[in-house]
């Protein structure tokens, strides 16, 4: 008997299917992998993983076949759970990695659980079901869900489905997703409020990508750097995640839906539209024009903005104007008057007064100090 060092997704899937057919019951992933490793015999040669090509060159069919052949280490070998429903990044994300991707195996028994990392679920084909405390979300092909740490949920893929999960350590998510929004702090603050609400209630972002090939290719390369392990793998995987989020925000930000247990999907999504409108029209938007655009009365909209951002409308718009002014002062040779006009101030003295109040010096002094 030779010591077993890995099992494949296909072996786990076959074991789960055969047990379910024989008994009508499902086993957990941990139980199946433990049983396979206890057999202490590997029936297959080590899977051949393509090293010489980029996985985004694989067709979807080739990639799906590769997913089933990927080797899975004994993740739970040295793990002793302190809670039945809370799973930390270790053992799920291997030591030394900040990103890890897995394929959802059918006929696996799961349970509602939470963890301390971010989880991105995506469906290539079929359906993937996510069960939250008071809601079930079904993902169809091309749909994607980002689940926040601490959210209690259960996930299972329907028969003959291809669904994957990308798991990202919390600090890595912070340094990729929110960094991309660094010049749109209004949106970043709102997403951060939703995703870091420190509750067991459901908190997630939902995207529709129309089964885009660019999304497929990006996910394939993330998997590549999770399984072809060398001294560059983790750095490359983090870079791939950065690119992946860039693709989502560039091409599919208009499809974002937000769910937070404390508020309905519609309310959160409508407020996101309000923030996006403020972000895109900060030079000219007024509270009156915003109310007319979204059909709210002024007092209600003021309270809604403060509740979701912790700031009032005037402060938000002023910060957006001055943040853009800083960028123009730093990266262009435009005159102070031109910058004032571009960011929405039609009186340069008024602009300078606001700028000095926030940054403790007038715009000209700030530029000369660079």
Annotate the PLM regions.
Residues 98-188:
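N-terminal regulatory/effector-sensing and dimerization cores
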